[in-house]
Amino acid sequence: MTRIHPTAIVEPGAQIDESVEIGPYAIVGPHVTIGARTTIGSHSVIEGHTTLGEDNRIGHYASVGGRPQDMKYKDEPTKLVIGNRNTIREFTTIHTGTVQDVGVTTLGDDNWIMAYVHIGHDCRVGNNVILSSNAQMAGHVEIGDFAIIGGMSGVHQFVRIGAHSMLGGASALVQDIPPFVIAAGNKAEPHGINVEGLRRRGFSADAISALRSAYRVLYKNGLSLEEAKVQLRELAEAGGDGDAPVTALVEFIDASQRGIIR
C-alpha cells in the first residue's frame, strides 16, 4: 500500500506504484510516474514529465523535473527519465530537456548524487556515476559510466566526461575528459590514469598497463593530437586486454566536439 503523508500533495494523473513512500509536504505533479519501492523525502518537488524507476531514494528538498534554465524554453512537454536504484540527496536540482536537443534529460541506474548537485537540461548521466556535493553540470553534459565528479566542480555545457574518469574537487572543466583519465584544476588538466578505480572494477594488469602507455602517447610524448591518434590506433591493435579500452579511448577522442583536455 502506498504510504503518502497526509501533508503531501499528489496531483491527479500521477502514476504512483503502491509501494512508493512520499514524505511530509512533498509535491508530485500530474505527469509524474514513480516506480516500485521509491521513497520521496519531505518537502521535495517531483514535477514535469518525469519518470522515476524502481528503488530510488530522493532526499529532502530535492527539485526533480523542473523547467530547464534555458531562455529558449517555451513550455514544451520535454522529459526527465531516471532509472533504478539511484540515490539523490538533499537540495539536488535536475531539470527536464529542451527541444533544441533530444528533449530528454536522462539519469541511468545505481548513481550516487550528493547534496546540492545540479544536473542541467539535456544532460545524459550513465550508470554507477558519483556526483559529489555541489557539483554543477550545465546543459547537454554527458557523463559516462563509473565516472566520479568531485565536490564544488563546475562543468561547462556540452562537455563529455568519459567512462571511469575522475574530476577532482573544485575543478572547472571546459573540455572533454577522455575515458579512464584523472583531471583536476581550474581549468582542469590531465593527471594520469584512474588506476585505483580501474583495479576496483576488475580491469586486468595488462589493460591498465596499456592505458598507461596510451596516456603517455597522448600527453607525455610531445605529439600533436593527430600524431598521437595514429600511435593510439596502433596500440589498440596490440592483441591483449588493452585493445578494447584503448579503442574506446580513441573513439571518444574522435567524437569530441569541444576538444579534449590537454
UniProtKB/Swiss-Prot annotation:
Record EC number = 2.3.1.129
User: What SUPFAM superfamilies does this protein map onto?
Assistant: Trimeric LpxA-like enzymes
Q: Which InterPro entries match?
A: Acetyltransf_C, Acetyltransf_C_sf, Hexapep, Lipid_A_LpxA, Trimer_LpxA-like_sf
Q: Which GO terms describe its molecular function?
A: acyl-[acyl-carrier-protein]-UDP-N-acetylglucosamine O-acyltransferase activity
Keywords noted in UniProt: Acyltransferase, Cytoplasm, Lipid A biosynthesis, Lipid biosynthesis, Lipid metabolism, Repeat, Transferase
Q: Looking at its record, which EC class is this enzyme?
A: transferase
Task: Indicate where this protein is primarily found.
Answer: cytoplasm
Q: Which GO terms describe its biological process?
A: lipid A biosynthetic process
Its pathway, per UniProt, is: Glycolipid biosynthesis; lipid IV(A) biosynthesis; lipid IV(A) from (3R)-3-hydroxytetradecanoyl-[acyl-carrier-protein] and UDP-N-acetyl-alpha-D-glucosamine: step 1/6
**Gene Ontology cellular-component annotations:** cytoplasm; membrane
Name the reaction it catalyses.
Answer: a (3R)-hydroxyacyl-[ACP] + UDP-N-acetyl-alpha-D-glucosamine = a UDP-3-O-[(3R)-3-hydroxyacyl]-N-acetyl-alpha-D-glucosamine + holo-[ACP]
Subunit notes for this chain? Homotrimer.
Q: Summarize the protein's role.
A: Involved in the biosynthesis of lipid A, a phosphorylated glycolipid that anchors the lipopolysaccharide to the outer membrane of the cell.
Q: What family is it from?
A: Belongs to the transferase hexapeptide repeat family. LpxA subfamily.
The family database entries (HAMAP family) matched by this protein are listed as: LpxA (MF_00387)
Q: What is this protein called?
A: Acyl-[acyl-carrier-protein]--UDP-N-acetylglucosamine O-acyltransferase
Q: Which species does the entry assign this protein to?
A: Burkholderia cenocepacia (strain HI2424)
